[in-house]
C-alpha cells in the first residue's frame, strides 16, 4: 500500500473555485481500489467545519508557529485541514498576500507530509513541497506560476540563497514556485498527454518551456477524469428528477426548474466556472448583444476577476430578461445549469484540459467550445458538441448557430455516451507514483 498526501488549495466538496477541486476530490477515491491510500490536505478556509485532531508546529520567518489540524471524511476520502494564519477568509484565492499565505501553508504541510510515502502537489500553491519531500507535481494551469520577491521568500522559508539561480528557483529576478516544483519533484505530470508536449514549446510554455525541455524525462501527460459517481444525472441529489441517456424524461423537469430559478426562457446558454480572461469571457461579453438579438439567453455563474464580475453585473442590469449572473460558488445551481441549459459555453483562449465540457456532456447538454487544448481532445465536433477555431465574437456566434442548426438536443444525448471516468487515469497515476518511489 502506497500512502500519498495530496496537497492543494481546493478540493470538492469542501472548497471549489474550478476544475482543480474536482480532480483533487475524485482522484483519491479512484486510487483506493488500486492499492493507494490517498489523503487530501487543504488550508482551513473560512466556513469549513472539521473535527480538530491535533496541532502542527512549523517555522515561518524564523519563528515557530502553530496551526490547528482538522479532519473530515467525505465520500470515503480523508480530508485534513491546516488552520494556518491568513486562511479564515471567504475566498480561496485573490488576495494580495496569497504568496505569503500559501508559503506558510506549505511549510506547515511539510510537517504533516512526514507520515506519508509521497506528496502529490497540485499547482503553484503546493510546489514548495518538492524541496522537502518525495513529490509528484501536477501542473494544472501553467499560466499561474507563483512569483515571489526573493528577499521575502528566503526570509519566510529559511531556505538558503544558494537556491536562487537559473537551474533552481530564479526566474527573471524573482522566485518562481512552479519552476521549483518542476525542478525538484521526482515526477511532473500535466492534465493530458498532448499538453505535456505543447508546454515544451515557446508558444505554450509560458516562459518555462526551456525548464520543461530540460526535465522532459520525468514529465508525463495523463488526461483528467471525471468523478462519475458525483456527476451522475441518474442519481444527482441537486436535480429535481433523475434521468439517463436511455430515459432522458427527467431532463425536461430540470429545464423547468432552471427556468423558474433564473427567470430565463429558453434557449439558454450557460457558463459555469472561474471568471478569468483565460476562459474567453471577453468573447461572451462582446457577442452578447448579437446573441440576445437572436433570441438566446445567458446564464453565468462563477467568481474571480473583479472587472469581469462588474461587467456581468452590468449586463444583467441592462438586460434583466436576457441575462442572469450568479457571482458565487453554488454547486446546486451549477448542476441545475448543466442539466437545464440548452448549451454550455467553453470559449477558452487556452485550456490545458478542462472539465466543464466533460460535465456538460455527462448531463446531456452539448458544449460550444473553442478548438484548443483539452477541449479539442474531448469534444466530438459536429456529433456531441461544436468546436470553433477563431478567437473572435464571430467565432463564438458561428459555433452557437452551428450547434442549433445541427440539433442541440440530439448532440446532447450523444454526448452522454462518452466515458470520462477516472479508472484509466488512476492506473496511470499509480505507475507514476511507483516510478517516483522506485
Swiss-Prot record:
Keyword field contains Glycosyltransferase: yes
Reaction equation(s) it catalyzes: [(1->4)-alpha-D-glucosyl](n) + ADP-alpha-D-glucose = [(1->4)-alpha-D-glucosyl](n+1) + ADP + H(+)
GO biological process: glycogen biosynthetic process
Keyword set includes NADP: no
Pathway connected to this protein: Glycan biosynthesis; glycogen biosynthesis
Keyword vocabulary terms for this entry: Glycogen biosynthesis, Glycosyltransferase, Transferase
CDD domains on file: GT5_Glycogen_synthase_DULL1-like (cd03791)
Class of this enzyme: transferase
MF-aspect GO terms: alpha-1,4-glucan glucosyltransferase (ADP-glucose donor) activity; alpha-1,4-glucan glucosyltransferase (UDP-glucose donor) activity
Domain of life of the source: Bacteria
Its EC number(s): 2.4.1.21
Residue stretches in coiled coil: none
Binding site for ADP-alpha-D-glucose: 16
Stored HAMAP family: Glycogen_synth
Cited function: Synthesizes alpha-1,4-glucan chains using ADP-glucose.
Family as reported in the entry's similarity comment: Belongs to the glycosyltransferase 1 family. Bacterial/plant glycogen synthase subfamily.
PANTHER family: ALPHA AMYLASE DOMAIN-CONTAINING PROTEIN, GRANULE-BOUND STARCH SYNTHASE 1, CHLOROPLASTIC/AMYLOPLASTIC
Protein's UniProt name: Glycogen synthase
Amino acid at each position: 500500500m502506497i500512502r500519498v498526501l495530496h496537497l492543494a488549495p481546493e478540493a470538492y466538496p469542501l472548497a471549489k473555485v474550478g476544475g482543480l477541486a474536482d480532480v483533487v476530490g475524485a482522484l483519491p477515491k479512484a486510487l483506493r481500489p488500486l492499492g493507494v491510500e490517498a489523503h487530501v490536505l487543504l488550508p482551513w478556509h473560512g466556513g469549513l467545519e472539521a473535527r480538530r485532531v491535533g496541532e502542527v508546529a512549523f517555522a515561518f520567518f524564523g519563528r515557530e508557529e502553530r496551526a490547528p489540524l482538522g479532519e473530515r471524511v467525505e465520500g470515503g476520502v480523508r480530508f485534513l485541514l491546516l488552520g494556518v494564519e491568513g486562511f479564515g477568509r471567504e475566498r480561496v484565492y485573490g488576495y494580495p498576500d496569497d504568496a505569503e499565505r500559501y508559503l506558510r501553508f506549505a511549510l506547515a504541510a511539510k510537517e504533516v507530509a512526514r507520515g506519508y510515502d509521497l506528496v502529490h502537489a497540485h499547482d503553484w500553491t503546493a510546489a514548495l513541497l518538492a524541496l522537502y519531500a518525495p513529490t509528484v507535481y501536477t501542473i494544472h494551469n501553467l499560466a499561474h506560476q507563483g512569483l515571489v520577491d526573493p528577499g521575502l521568500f528566503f526570509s519566510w522559508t529559511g531556505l538558503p540563497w544558494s537556491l536562487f539561480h537559473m537551474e533552481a528557483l530564479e526566474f527573471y529576478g524573482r522566485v518562481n514556485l512552479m519552476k521549483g516544483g518542476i525542478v525538484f519533484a521526482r515526477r511532473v505530470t500535466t492534465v493530458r498527454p498532448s499538453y505535456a508536449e505543447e508546454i515544451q514549446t515557446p508558444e505554450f510554455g509560458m516562459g518555462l518551456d526551456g525548464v520543461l525541455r530540460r526535465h522532459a524525462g520525468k514529465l508525463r501527460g495523463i488526461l483528467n477524469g471525471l468523478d462519475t459517481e458525483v456527476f451522475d444525472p441518474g442519481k444527482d441529489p441537486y436535480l429535481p428528477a433523475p434521468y439517463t441517456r436511455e430515459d432522458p424524461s427527467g431532463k425536461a423537469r430540470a429545464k423547468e426548474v432552471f427556468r423558474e430559478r433564473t427567470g430565463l426562457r429558453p434557449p439558454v446558454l450557460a457558463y459555469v466556472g472561474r471568471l478569468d480572461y483565460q476562459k474567453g469571457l471577453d468573447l461572451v461579453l462582446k457577442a452578447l448583444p448579437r446573441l440576445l438579438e437572436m433570441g438566446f439567453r445567458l446564464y453565468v455563474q462563477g467568481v474571480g476577476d473583479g472587472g469581469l464580475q462588474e461587467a456581468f453585473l452590468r449586463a444583467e442590469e441592462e438586460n434583466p430578461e436576457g441575462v442572469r449572473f450568479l457571482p458565487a460558488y453554488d454547486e446546486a445551481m451549477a448542476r441545475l445549469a448543466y442539466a437545464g441549459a440548452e448549451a454550455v459555453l467553453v470559449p477558452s483562449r487556452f485550456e490545458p484540459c478542462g472539465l466543464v465540457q466533460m460535465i456538460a456532456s455527462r448531463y446531456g447538454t452539448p458544449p460550444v467550445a473553442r478548438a484548443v487544448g483539452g477541449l479539442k481532445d474531448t469534444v466530438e465536433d459536429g456529433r456531441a458538441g461544436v468546436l470553433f477555431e477563431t478567437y473572435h465574437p464571430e467565432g463564438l456566434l458561428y459555433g452557437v448557430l452551428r450547434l442549433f442548426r445541427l440539433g442541440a438536443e440530439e448532440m446532447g444525448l450523444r454526448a452522454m455516451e462518452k466515458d470520462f471516468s477516472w479508472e484509466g487515469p488512476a492506473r496511470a497515476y499509480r505507475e507514476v507514483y511507483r516510478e517516483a518511489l522506485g
